[in-house]
Amino acid sequence: MKLRDILALMYKIHKDSGISMPYLTGGVPRDKILGLIRDEISDLDITTGDASIHNLAKEFSISLGHQYSIDSKQMDDGHTSVYVGNLKIDFSSNFEVPSAEQILKKHGIKNPTDLQKEVFSRDFTCNTLLMTLDLKKIKDPTKQGFPDIKKKILKTCLDPDITLRYNPNRIIRVIYLASKLGFDVDPEIIEWVSKNKDFVRMSSEGYLAKNLDKALSKDPDRSVYLITKMNLWDTLPITDSLYPYYAKKSVIKGAQWRTNYDYGEGLYMNLDKYKSVSEFRRKRRKNRLKQLRKLKDMKLK
């Protein structure tokens, strides 16, 4: 079944059942703005911004199930995942942070709608964009999504103490998303995590390991830099992909070091002194050239 047919069915259910307007949110509109959508889309996030999302998920599963073999699962956090072939469709849990209305009023939104309360309760501003089901328009309800994507910075929608405290799974996603997208991380997030790192332990070790390995596969420099900046070396599980960097950081006796990690300068042991990943990479390139010149001089002698 083609994507447009799936979205057309979703729109029909919305019209016929009086369900609030559904939108694509999360990765698809974000990646569209970033120019990252090239292949077939395999993951959709859907929201209506209110409790009618649960009715949409149910009716969509029933309608599609009459024509295709599907698998529908109710997840622990309250969202519904529907699998159609290689496509996964996640229907929002409609999560709202406690006292969302009062918090938004303090931010100058006098009478926040259900959609605004749901969107501001999301993890990061880059994931709050809303795309219409005809794929023609993208809205920015927080007015923070477009600017932060343009600046390539990861920021929480509300204060990190609210956004991360109420869902600690989002902490490891800071590392994963920043590494995946090549984004810098808001210093307020880094400061909050470094002071509240015990919240990381509220996530399962399997969830942490999965996201950590995905992050390292995308951009190991950025991943290791953020782990160091947020002081998480003694909190995260040391997976096989993280171990070589942990060995460098901790100077584990007998560890098998790879000399091309720091080019003899111990860069990974002093990551906290760098202001950004870019500064670290410039220093590493400089050291690499320095090392190559030394080798060249030795050969000439």
Where are these regions (language model features)?
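Catalytic cores of the polymerase beta-like nucleotidyltransferase superfamily
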Residues: 1-301
